[in-house]
């Protein structure tokens, strides 16, 4: 017989998992209608939380941990805000940690969160799954990976399919006449760094563009490496005419050095960033981006963690990405025809 979980109760009651969790935990921040519907669903499904979940509730801290890769990264700042608000609505406070893209700092924060006996942890993991990441598994602490994963670990996750957005970006630049596209990659110690680099390599090959390895600079998802990457790429004997930065902070670094060098973005050189930060659209010129919903990612991560805390085994979720064309990837050459893309 298939075990009934809180996700089933929420679906039958027509409420979110967070609302069902609040009702079942006795949180007063619920409406009479929601309480009635959840109670009816519990009765109809004969829902009985498993022993592990009951034990967790009897000693719970009403807190969760969130460990992000770099709090300076606008993407992770937005993610933290969404997670904090969604968790609070479900009756949990969020303890935030910053790994600063360093494994030893990641381990220190995870050890601290474990010692604080949080009810579950959402983490954007770095590394190969050793150290404190492994401790989460051996101690059976409810865990959800967000944005990134670790190869070989069966942890529920919510991530982004980078393939479509990167393919659209390369096609857009190729259609505009660019044949040498510089790529500022994320670190290969992260799943996103590896996946996005692989997607870029496939897209370049499919478009028949130059696969010169010198056109790739491996950064570390921090602004300084974005600046260093642009500087290195522009020193090539045949420099690129377009750039694709694999995340928002490296894009910020790229913008800074291009301004310093007097290179006009959108006129002298095209630039596209992975991640759509709100103020990217306000720049002059507005920045073309590969967009994916950080708000949806955060909400889903919290819902998944609540299911794991309840003893459930949610399926991992992969969100889509898409190119948003703005002025930063305009070009003086006449673009070839291609599929229509979202503009904003």
PLM region spans:
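Short beta-strand segments enriched in small/hydrophobic residues
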Residues: 17-21, 56-72, 172, 180-187
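Short beta->alpha connector loops
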Residues: 100-103, 124-129, 249
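Acidic, Gly/Pro-rich loop/turn segments at junctions of secondary structure
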Residues: 122-133, 145-155
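N-terminal helix-turn-helix DNA-binding module of bacterial transcription factors
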Residues: 1-62, 330-333, 339-344
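Amphipathic helical "hinge" segments at domain boundaries
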Residues: 47-112, 116-120, 198-201, 205
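Short hydrophobic/charged patches on amphipathic alpha-helices used for structural packing
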Residues: 53, 107-110, 133, 170, ...
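Bacterial carbohydrate/catabolite-sensing allosteric modules
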Residues: 44, 82-90, 114, 138-145, ...
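Short acidic/polar active-site loop segments enriched in Thr and Asp
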Residues: 16, 62, 119, 178-180, ...
């Amino acid at each position: 017989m298939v075990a009934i979980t809180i996700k089933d109760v929420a679906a039958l009651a027509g409420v979110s998992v967070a609302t069902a969790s609040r009702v079942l935990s006795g949180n007063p921040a619920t409406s009479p209608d929601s309480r009635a519907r959840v109670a009816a669903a519990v009765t109809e499904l004969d829902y009985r939380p498993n022993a592990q979940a009951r034990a967790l509730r009897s000693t719970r801290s009403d807190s969760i941990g969130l460990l992000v890769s770099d709090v300076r990264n606008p993407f992770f700042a937005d993610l933290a805000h969404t997670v904090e608000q969604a968790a609070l609505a479900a009756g949990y406070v969020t303890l935030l940690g910053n790994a600063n893209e360093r494994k030893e700092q990641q381990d220190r924060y995870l050890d601290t969160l474990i010692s604080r006996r949080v009810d579950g942890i959402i983490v954007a993991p770095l590394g190969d799954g050793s150290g404190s990441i492994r401790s989460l598994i051996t101690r059976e602490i409810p865990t959800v990976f967000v944005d990134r994963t670790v190869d070989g670990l069966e942890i529920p996750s919510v991530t982004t399919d980078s393939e479509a957005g990167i393919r659209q970006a390369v096609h857009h630049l190729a259609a505009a006449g660019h044949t040498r596209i510089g790529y500022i990659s994320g670190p290969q110690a992260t799943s996103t760094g590896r996946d996005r680099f692989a997607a870029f390599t496939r897209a370049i090959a499919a478009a028949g563009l130059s696969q010169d390895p010198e056109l790739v600079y491996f950064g570390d998802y921090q602004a300084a490496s974005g600046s260093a990457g642009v500087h290195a790429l522009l020193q090539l004997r045949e420099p690129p005419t377009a750039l694709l930065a694999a995340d928002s902070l490296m894009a910020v670094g790229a913008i800074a050095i291009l301004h310093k060098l007097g290179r006009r973005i959108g006129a002298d050189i095209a630039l596209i960033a992975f991640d759509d930060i709100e103020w990217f659209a306000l720049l002059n010129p507005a920045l073309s981006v590969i967009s994916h919903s950080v708000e949806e990612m955060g909400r889903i991560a919290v819902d998944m963690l609540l299911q794991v805390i309840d003893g459930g085994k949610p399926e991992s979720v992969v969100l889509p990405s898409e190119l948003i064309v703005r002025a930063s990837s305009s070009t003086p050459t006449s673009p070839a025809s291609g599929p229509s893309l979202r503009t904003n």
